[in-house]
């Protein structure tokens, strides 16, 4: 019963990224802790103590003398399910180790009534972000097709939008594929075969991390493009290659460095744990830099727009242009920058519940917001769609009129031919009657 509760909780733990079955990962972590315990006990000299060091399948106990009480924290492998910090103990007696006390479930808080609500919360969050990524993927795909179909929409601005769309689509696909593998219940578990599939598991995680980082950097490219457009340092079209290098190149370099540090420093499991700080910061620092730079660009863009909109030198046409620019972009940059900045600057003081809601629920609908702002509400896109719709309507109307005209001409021709035929028969009859007379 105790193991089933823990495994159920583990299956719905959403903050981890994995590509193997959760139960297999659970057993793997138990094996890793057992190996560490064996190494620790082998390095210690027992000095003929009454109670030798032992691994009791969940916790490592050091050697002790009779009458000594050994106290250890709750097992590390269950740390994701602690409702409160706790300790468990054992006494060393003349007959050996005593039973663990206090009760394992009571000491570590696994029977906390909040556990059921937490599991329900994780299930709800998973359902919400699955819906969000699915809707975002469909809307982004539709928006990309629209931009690609109309040649008048082919420009540097929309090329950048397409790359941003692609980064969001890849992010959604990587999350949905990861979840389909992680929460798949088809087939029998063969955990002893899982280590042979670590390569595919690690590759899936590398792809996932790359999509996340590329998405952040294409949001940064959008901010850079808008800032360049406002300050007019260089023509935006001349910077497109640099934008490509920033959006796809920098994440490639960073993920390559992260892979190298993982292989050399923490090549364990599916690379979804962060026990070593160096690989964690190798992948986290570039994302933090993009968030901070994008937030600084947002502040600068707001300042420039306010100056231009309040300037008396700005004419009516220019002012309306800046207003359109502000409507289509200023709603986007705060949405992608401000809440990320909050969690980047204050990661400790904010509840993990709110962070999960923002990162998973709100973040999953970002692709939908991007598609709406940069495609469906874009005046150029709407004009092209209306023009194409009018063209289709006119084509159908013309085809219908042509069919009606052809049918009318055919009918008139048939009636004329019938009248001529009748007249010729009458004339022939009269001629025959006359000849008889």
Curated annotation (Swiss-Prot):
Membrane topology according to the record: Multi-pass membrane protein
Signal peptide extent: 1-22
Assembly mode: Interacts with ADCYAP1/PACAP (via N-terminal extracellular domain); activated by PACAP27 and CAPAC38 neuropeptides. Interacts with VIP; the interaction results in VIPR1 activation.
Record topological domains on the Cytoplasmic side: 150-157, 228-238, 304-324, 378-437
Primary localisation category: membrane
A Pfam family this chain is assigned to: HRM
UniProt-recorded name of the protein: Vasoactive intestinal polypeptide receptor 2
Organism whose genome encodes this protein: Mus musculus
Residue pairs linked by disulfide bridges in the UniProt entry: 37-60, 51-92, 74-108, 201-270
Gene Ontology terms: biological process: adenylate cyclase-activating G protein-coupled receptor signaling pathway; cell surface receptor signaling pathway
Residues with attached carbohydrate: 57, 87, 91
Protein location: Cell membrane
Keyword NADP: no
Role noted for this protein: G protein-coupled receptor activated by the neuropeptides vasoactive intestinal peptide (VIP) and pituitary adenylate cyclase-activating polypeptide (ADCYAP1/PACAP). Binds VIP and both PACAP27 and PACAP38 bioactive peptides with the order of ligand affinity of VIP = PACAP38 > PACAP27. Ligand binding causes a conformation change that triggers signaling via guanine nucleotide-binding proteins (G proteins) and modulates the activity of downstream effectors. Activates cAMP-dependent pathway. May be coupled to phospholipase C.
GO molecular function: pituitary adenylate cyclase-activating polypeptide receptor activity; vasoactive intestinal polypeptide receptor activity
Positions of transmembrane segments: 124-149, 158-179, 203-227, 239-260, 280-303, 325-345, 354-377
Recorded GO CC terms: plasma membrane
Alphabetized UniProt keyword annotations: Cell membrane, Disulfide bond, G-protein coupled receptor, Glycoprotein, Membrane, Receptor, Signal, Transducer, Transmembrane, Transmembrane helix
Family recorded in the similarity comment: Belongs to the G-protein coupled receptor 2 family.
